[in-house]
Amino acid sequence: MALSQATPFSATELLLASATFCLVFWVVKAWQPRVPKGLKSPPGPWSWPLIGHVLTLGKSPHLALSRLSQRYGDVLQIRIGCTPVLVLSGLDTIRQALVRQGDDFKGRPDLYSFTLVADGQSMTFNPDSGPVWAAQRRLAQNALNSFSVASDPASSSSCYLEMHVSKEAEALIGKFQELMAGSGRFDPYDHVVVSVAKVIGAMCFGQHFPQSSGEMVSLVRNTHDFVETASSGSPVDFFPILKYLPNPALQKYKSFNRRFLQFLWKMVQEHHQDFDKNRVQDIVGALFKHYEDNSRASGGLMPQKKTVNLVNDIFAAGFDPITTAISWSLLYLVTNPEIQRKIQQELDTVIGRARRPRLSDRSQLPYLEAFILETFRHSSFVPFTIPHSTIRDTTLNGFYIPKELCVFINQWQVNHDPKLWGDPSEFRPERFLTSHDTTISKTLSEKVMLFGMGKRRCIGEVLAKWEIFLFLAILLQQLEFSVPPGVKVDLTPTYGLTMKPAPCEHVQARLRFPIK
């Protein structure tokens, strides 16, 4: 039988199909970097043309990529749109990349959403990783840490952080009592978010921070407009056309960044009007003094502008993770009342009821500390670090990793790795205690990933851990949290840069003893 009779395709159609196949094959090969002899590219699943693995990622990329790591290993590669993305899982692999090979992986990808933060001048989101970035990071970290541990001579508190947290925690207790006297229930997030904002605001701006500003409250209660688009795998970063199409989430993100920057500008300018370099009492004052003393190194930017850019990062580092952690903690407490009772027994034994908890009590409250660590691990509310990128060609675990490759660090996978935790789905604070339940296991606590690693580690980590501890210690000393019988608390997170718990408007709080 002749070929023309055996096939329904014409010679022209077959030729066109062959040409198309060759073109697609050539494009795919062109996308792939040239791999040096003896090395290989990271493995990964087959991807759809144009859209890559976006359908695979779905609404919970941290879960999807954790499943893929079980099949392809700790170093795998996917595509989002046409952009290759390296995904790192496994504690040892991540530590190798971010710590031992930290200089190779310290970059940031040049993503569209990053350019909208602080007009593209954010130290945290900026692709720059050179000496200027390193100096700015040191300055921000030193300012934040200094005013966490520095003390106010007029206060009985050990440091500014303790003074501000104690004040806001007491105010929060009063607010919860007021809500209980009214509706008899509340959503803790709506009120925790304002209290935490007041703490970092007071540390940054001192008396200049507006404690009851409607603008401030509106901003901090709408941070979800930021974290949704700033999350790893945000479509707008990988599909450029989305910048030009109707996109409500992107518009909210732009609006939030614009409003937040304007708010900080106003605060910084007001502070600068009565700045006295001989009387520095907050982070902004310390930054003004630094830039004034080092005016030749200002890089052409006015002190106010440089200060706004840094405060944008400092405020974020000392605000959203802390708010999210406390909110998750309260929900774990109401769903695990026996754990709450153990924490309160520890507080009663160590501190009693005659005085308030202090930061110096932290080492004497191992069960509370274990609960906080388990909240970090189980919720993994920062599922990925802010994306990294490679600044030069390198290798990792025998795989060739080219320069300028976008890198996702899957912290959620580490915190739920059965090889590390045995029963990762169980909420069990005791796992972090030593055999005598008197101290925290340093080895195990260092395996919890929430603040990143290496040269891009979150500058607010120390502040966050201290502040979360003190807020919870004060709240739990005085209040017992619960939900009404029959109410089921939804612990399903909403994916974002930080994953928030679902709103829970049924939380109740009662005083454990009369407050003097």
Curated annotation (Swiss-Prot):
Keywords, ordered alphabetically: Endoplasmic reticulum, Fatty acid metabolism, Glycoprotein, Heme, Iron, Lipid metabolism, Lyase, Membrane, Metal-binding, Microsome, Monooxygenase, Oxidoreductase, Steroid metabolism, Sterol metabolism
Principal location listed in the UniProt entry: endoplasmic reticulum
GO BP, sorted A to Z: arachidonate metabolic process; cholesterol metabolic process; estrogen metabolic process; hormone biosynthetic process; progesterone metabolic process; retinol metabolic process
Keyword Membrane: yes
Gene Ontology CC: endoplasmic reticulum membrane
Subunit (UniProt): Interacts with PGRMC1; the interaction requires PGRMC1 homodimerization.
Substrates-to-products reaction catalysed: an organic molecule + reduced [NADPH--hemoprotein reductase] + O2 = an alcohol + oxidized [NADPH--hemoprotein reductase] + H2O + H(+); 17beta-estradiol + reduced [NADPH--hemoprotein reductase] + O2 = 2-hydroxy-17beta-estradiol + oxidized [NADPH--hemoprotein reductase] + H2O + H(+); 17beta-estradiol + reduced [NADPH--hemoprotein reductase] + O2 = 4-hydroxy-17beta-estradiol + oxidized [NADPH--hemoprotein reductase] + H2O + H(+); estrone + reduced [NADPH--hemoprotein reductase] + O2 = 2-hydroxyestrone + oxidized [NADPH--hemoprotein reductase] + H2O + H(+)
Known EC number: 1.14.14.1, 4.2.1.152
Binding positions for substrate per the UniProt entry: 226
Pfam families per the UniProt record, alphabetical: p450
Organism: Balaenoptera acutorostrata (Common minke whale)
Name of the protein: Cytochrome P450 1A2
InterPro entries: Cyt_P450, Cyt_P450_CS, Cyt_P450_E_grp-I, Cyt_P450_E_grp-I_CYP1, Cyt_P450_sf
Domain of life: Eukaryota
Function text: A cytochrome P450 monooxygenase involved in the metabolism of various endogenous substrates, including fatty acids, steroid hormones and vitamins. Mechanistically, uses molecular oxygen inserting one oxygen atom into a substrate, and reducing the second into a water molecule, with two electrons provided by NADPH via cytochrome P450 reductase (NADPH--hemoprotein reductase). Catalyzes the hydroxylation of carbon-hydrogen bonds. Exhibits high catalytic activity for the formation of hydroxyestrogens from estrone (E1) and 17beta-estradiol (E2), namely 2-hydroxy E1 and E2.
Binding site for heme: 458
Topology term for the membrane: Peripheral membrane protein
Gene3D superfamilies membership: Cytochrome P450
UniProt GO MF annotations: estrogen 16-alpha-hydroxylase activity; estrogen 2-hydroxylase activity; heme binding; hydroperoxy icosatetraenoate dehydratase activity; iron ion binding; steroid 17-alpha-monooxygenase activity
UniProt pathway: Cofactor metabolism; retinol metabolism; Steroid metabolism; cholesterol metabolism; Lipid metabolism; arachidonate metabolism
Glycosylation: residue positions: 69
Cofactors: heme
Record localization: Endoplasmic reticulum membrane; Microsome membrane
